[in-house]
Amino acid sequence: LSPDELLALGQKGRKQTVKRGQTLVWEGDDSLVVANVISGVLKLSVSTADGREQIVGIVFPSDFIGRPFGKESPYSVTALSDAEVCVFHRSTFDQFAREHPELQHKLLQRTLIELDDARQWMMLLGKKTAEERIATLLLRISERLSADGCTGPLLNLDEFELPMDRQQMADILGLTIETVSRQLTRIKSSGVIALPDRRRVVIHDRQALLDLAEAA
C-alpha cells in the first residue's frame, strides 16, 4: 500500500491494549473485528473435545489477526504478554479491501505464508526430536521478536524474554512439561544458551543452536 493508503487504513482502526492473559477474540464468536499486532505476543488456541486448550499458533508484531471475509473465529486470541493491537471492524476493513486490490493481494500473500508455516510445523511435530523442536522454537522466537524494532529500539536477537511458560511451550511442541524442562536444561548445560531466570533466554552460540534445530 502507498503511504496515503496506509494512513487512510490506519484512520479506520483504533489502538487497543491487551493485557497478559486477556482474550481479544473467542473461538466460535462472530468474526466482527480484525487486527494488526503493534507490539507484544499473542496465542491462537482452540478447545479440544475433552475441554483442553491446544495452542495452534503464535502471533508477533506486524502479524495480522482475524478472518476479514469469514463468518466466525476458528480460534481464540489471547495475549501471552502485554500487547498493543490496531483493531478494525471487519465490515469496515472488508470495504476498504474491496476498494484497494493491493490490500487483497497482501492478504493472499499472508494466507500463503501461513500455509507454508503450517507445513513447516507439521514437519517439526512429525519428524524432529524434542531437542530439535525446542531449538527451533527458541530460534523462531528470537527472530520474530527482533521485528519489534520497527516500533521501538532494535532488540538483541541473542537475548530475549520467552512470551510463554513451560506448559505452553509443551502444548505448542507436542511435548510434556517435564520433557521441555529437561531439554532446556540439557541445552543450557552444553553452553549453547543461558537461562538467567524462568523467562529470560541468552543465546551464546547461535550456530550450535541452528545445528541442533536442523539435525533432523
For each predicted feature, which ranges?
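Cyclic nucleotide-binding regulatory domains
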Residues: Q22-D82
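Polybasic "coupling" helices that flank or enter modular domains
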Residues: R98, E102-T176
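Short aromatic/basic micro-patch
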Residues: V34, I58, V87, P163, ...
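Cyclic-nucleotide recognition modules
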Residues: G57-Q120
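Cyclic nucleotide-binding regulatory module and flanking cytosolic helices
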Residues: L1-R20, D63-I65, G70
